[in-house]
Amino acid sequence: MSDGCKYFEDFKVGDVFEFKGTPVTKEEIIEFAEIYDPQAHHLDEEAAKDSILGTFCASGWHSCAMLMRLICDTYLNEAEHIGSPGVNEVRWRKPIVPGDIFHVTRTVKAAKGVPGQGDRGMVQVFFDVKNQDGKPLMTMDCFALYRRREPLGEV
């Protein structure tokens, strides 16, 4: 599944694209946590009950990684993507628990050329991630560079 946006010129401010993932599993939450974020509430259901969140859940960083995988599988790997200079903001709204399914809405916030680099453009997008019940899980505001279909001037 792709949104048809391959080159910089394909991204229009205000465009919305929706996609979804598969259920998050307890096993993948633990596997990620054991390697990257070994806090009790990501590793043990009983210990999680006494945490500030009160429930066993995925690491926020795991949620970012899951979103990135969905982005790659859904459209990025088919696009003329060059890279990203960074993320403006990530907000974790609700714990991600086993069985949650990411329902993602991507909105194009800005699309501008890069001064002195006529072969590419910068796209700012906002991701709004909800679960299968429409409850907000996370948001992310970020930038990505894409090749132009037709380079402008010297590169």
Language model features by range: what are they?
Residues 1-85, 151-155:
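Hot-dog-fold acyl-thioester-processing enzymes
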Residues 3-12, 92, 96-155:
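HotDog/MaoC-like acyl-thioester-processing domains
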